[in-house]
Amino acid sequence: MLNQPPFLLSVYDYTGNWARPYIDAGWRVLLWDQHFEGSILEGFGRLVSLVEEENEGRVDGLLAAPPCTAFAASGARWWQYKDSPGSAEPPWESFTEQMVGLTLIVWEMVVRFRPRFWALENPVGRIEKLCPELKPFRRMSFNPCDYGDPYIKKTILWGDFNPNLPRNPVRPVEGSKMHRLPAGRRRSELRSVTPSGFARAFYKANHDLSINFASGRQLELFAS
C-alpha cells in the first residue's frame, strides 16, 4: 500500500516486547497471542483476514516465539508426560504434538505472507528434532547479557533475517534467573518475555527495508 508505514506481524508475543521497537518507530504492528486472541490454529482464517484488511495480505516482517514448554531442555524431565497420548485435548494426541502444530503454522505464514524478513525463536532444546524443517534456517544464538540484560538464557533464532545485531555485552550478574522463578502458569509467561535489549538490537539490524534480508530460499524449501 502506497505511503503506508511498514507492516509487522508478531505472533506468540504475549508482552509485545519483541515488537515494541517497531511500534515505537511507527510501524503498523499486528500482535497475536493465545492469551488475548485465542488459538492461532483455530483462528488462522481470522488472522489471514486481518492481514488482508491491514496490508492487502502482505507483511514486511514476521516474528514468532512459539511456546517452548514441550521443547526447552530446562523441562526435559516432563517430556515423557507431554509426549504421552491423552496429554492434550482432541484432536491432538499429545501436548507435544499440539506444540509442534503451533510451530509449523509459522511455515504457512511465511509462504502465504512472503515477509521481507522473518525470525522464530526458542530456547535450547529439542525443537529442531521435532520440527526438522527448521534446520536449514538456524541463524544465530544469544544470551540476554549479549545485548544489555544481565542474565543468561541461551536462545536460538531461525529464519531469514540479518543476524549482525549490534552487541552491548554486560556481566550476567543475575545469572540464570529463569530457574528462580516460582512454579505455575506465571512462570511460563515470565520465561517467554523477550529481553528488551535483544529486541532493540534486532530492530536496529532488521528495520531498513532497502536491504535485501531474505535469501529467497524459504519459499523454495517450504513449497517442496
Where are these regions (language model features)?
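Conserved active-site and SAM-binding loop architecture
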Residues: 1-224
